[in-house]
Amino acid sequence: MERIKELRDLMSQSRTREILTKTTVDHMAIIKKYTSGRQEKNPALRMKWMMAMKYPITADKRIMEMIPERNEQGQTLWSKTNDAGSDRVMVSPLAVTWWNRNGPTTSTVHYPKVYKTYFEKIERLKHGTFGPVRFRNQVKIRRRVDINPGHADLSSKEAQDVIMEVVFPNEVGARILTSESQLTITKEKKEELQDCKIAPLMVAYMFERELVRKTRFLPVAGGTSSVYIEVLHLTQGTCWEQMYTPGGEVRNDDVDQSLIIAARNIVRRAAVSADPLASLLEMCHSTQIGGIRMVDILRQNPTEEQAVDICKAAMGLRISSSFSFGGFTFKRTSGSSVKREEEVLTGNLQTLKIRVHEGYEEFTMVGRRATAILRKATRRLIQLIVSGRDEQSIAEAIIVAMVFSQEDCMIKAVRGDLNFVNRANQRLNPMHQLLRHFQKDAKVLFQNWGIEPIDNVMGMVGILPDMTPNTEMSLRGVRVSKMGVDEYSSTERVVVSIDRFLRVRDQRGNVLLSPEEVSETQGTEKLTITYSSSMMWEINGPESVLVNTYQWIIRNWETVKIQWSQDPTMLYNKMEFEPFQSLVLKAARGQYSGFVRTLFQQMRDVLGTFDTVQIIKLLPFAAAPPEQSRMQFSSLTVNVRGSGMRILVRGNSPVFNYNKATKRLTVLGKDAGALTEDPNEGTAGVESAVLRGFLILAKEDKRYGPALSINELSNLAKGEKANVLIGQGDVVLVMKRKRDSSILTDSQTATKRIRMAIN
């Protein structure tokens, strides 16, 4: 009672009432909030209030010698009174203006180099074009995006070492600079930053921006490359969007884009080879993107895309634990299941063996143009909430979810036989068979699914079998939402295994990825992709195969010619001749091969008919399995430029043209290299008869000691090798034959062998 009376008395005074009603700070919690702790609670207000004062800045005492007390207008620049609690001087904002105009100048040459990322951003914005603002509902979903355009892809540890080496070279501590990119960057930066006067800490901070990828989990509708993310606040709000075209590209976006294209091409090509995993690794290791080894990029680049992840898995790197189906990334958010094989009958009474997931599970599905939440039980879809950019995208997501649910009505909706094959002509697994079938035509699936009346829920509408929205009815369990489903935010990576058919599994044996999941979308890479592997010659079409095959023969002629004379079968089996076969009509392959092999055998048997150019020209044709026939050809046809073109067995043609004067070969008008030897050597007087019983292997090989005279050869044991002096003082390596039966042919081949070994 006493308290209330006291309060009443206080309230009766007009001053009390005024304080409590007119002033906003009338709550102890608020007073506490603004007065406790060192952290400034309202920086903007504090700044305005400070700047309204005469001397809001404090500076070191030395400033009094460097700045006059008054400026040209007679305004005071600093006060003689000390700053309370320190021995600093109180300074006016006008002093800053004076300093900027009249203070000492320093070299600005390093600024664009240190603040490179900022200067480049200004250029991009200057040249970018902003389009009209449109008001519409924005379906944003959170994605992990790169917020830092123009960076290299170093790990933070690698970057730390580079920064210490460049900015603080005299600091103690071991620094390990191993990767090629680390060394290149360190060298460039040390040169750039010689005599740099900018504070080292600032340099280090800016330098970090150039080296390390920074990602954030942000709501995005539209482009996700870093040059779009840097203007996110300008291009999309809650209910509006502004069209924008960046005024420049940055290397990190180009690397991401080119990496995806290279990985897709490699996975597609590997899938059709005899040993997909070995081929994939061979291609990843021999490919460069923008001059950097693809394997180095894969180790550092966090891009998550099906093909990229398959390549990473093959290299033994960790990848995200989400799995891919029908081009959507699935992440299980709750529930669990066990897998069991089950046989089911399609509407066409075809038997399929599917791995059924038994149990209740919830998933998020994220695709490029649609996202969804899926709740399912054993072979039953309970609920699917979809959102997408347009009708088509929403339909794609619904089909994938319906197939994934493994419901009986979906399997019964199959009309006709399922016999889809992959690029290697192998049948797809049953789940992908079903997916392909309904992706081609989902009419029966949607019609058979069933519809149900729906409740009116905010932000959700129904969708009918013809994919039109409806507020009363909807496909059973399916709703369309205005809100997108966020991408899985975690950056956790898991250990995976990969089999030789490129199927990637987690440690519990669940398939996360397979070549069927790799997109067929073709794009043009921003950076040059150099595939050194012969498996990728086809990627640029038949002409490239032709030129590359001949270039390869010429580059490796030294070893090729020895194999040609000693072990032709091994030579014909080389994978470098594989792509070439696709240029020759199936019907002619065997006949051409038989003809060329016979011709080659005659060259080996008959003295003086050895013709380097002709061997090079015909060699690729001999790689196909030969047919024994008596057919003779004067020209062989290859399919390039959309039609058959002839390669003449004797003589030049537009396809294969050898210029004797320059010793250069052109294939389809493109230079294919130079022959280092004279292809028409005269027959040297070789003591071939004396070399009976010996096999000529190669040029002199110093490891086998000094050259013996021909008489000394007789002391060699069978299978022993030695260098021997022949004819015009040339030295060749020979081996004494293990069998005597082949002695007859030795004298015939010796001439050609010697000639080859000498050259």
UniProtKB/Swiss-Prot annotation:
Motif annotated as Nuclear localization signal, chain positions: 736-739
Superkingdom of source: Viruses
Keyword Transmembrane helix: no
Gene Ontology molecular function: any one: RNA binding
Annotated site (Avian adaptation): E627
GO CC annotations on file: host cell nucleus; virion component
Matching HAMAP family: INV_PB2
Protein task: Plays an essential role in transcription initiation and cap-stealing mechanism, in which cellular capped pre-mRNAs are used to generate primers for viral transcription. Recognizes and binds the 7-methylguanosine-containing cap of the target pre-RNA which is subsequently cleaved after 10-13 nucleotides by the viral protein PA. Plays a role in the initiation of the viral genome replication and modulates the activity of the ribonucleoprotein (RNP) complex.
Protein name: Polymerase basic protein 2
Source organism (scientific name): Influenza A virus (strain A/Chicken/Weybridge H7N7) (Influenza A virus (strain A/FPV/Weybridge H7N7))
